[in-house]
Amino acid sequence: MFCAQQINIPPELPDLLKQFTKAAIRTQPHDVLQWSAAYFNALSRGEPLPVKERVEMPVATQKTDTGLTPGLLKILHKQLSSYQSVQPYELEQKWKDLCLPMEQLRSILALDNFGMEVEWIKFFALGCSTLGGSIRSALKHACEILTEDPEGGPARIPFETFTYLYLYLAEIDGEITVSQTESVLNTLQEEVDRQNGMVQPRNFMDALCPPLS
């Protein structure tokens, strides 16, 4: 039997457990054990943690309820955006760590002809499309996830990034013409020039902006 004096409690343990508990409450993982293993593995490696910034309600989209939410996609972006491309097994592991259904990952990957590597920014765009249903909604989600503005702010992102995402999603859609995308981008350019090269959802959701799709 051990007495209280013989039990050595690491001084950092209480704070570590406190932060872990807060993270679990914010993230609300479906599989606590799976998520906990991913949390402490990332913590030990000094990698971005699989933790939401705040509690959020699950999002049911027009297409299907994938279980993916803006908060979870933002976690994936923090974890994987430093790589231009990721191996499918790496993406699969991060997806599992967030307790998301594998069949939905496969359905997203099937939207493009990804090979042995997955270009992250393209997967991110498809994830936003899954969240939003329409291209306009997808790009709004992209702005809100990528922006450095505080929550509730204008959600600005570089126009170059917006253009890449828009043209890629238009290509995947297959029914949006080049003249249509050019009309949208040319219309937005005037606003972008006044905003130091940045675009925000208000610009492309305005009635004066041509339809994105």
What do these predicted regions represent?
Residues M1-S213:
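Phospho-regulatory, low-complexity terminal regions
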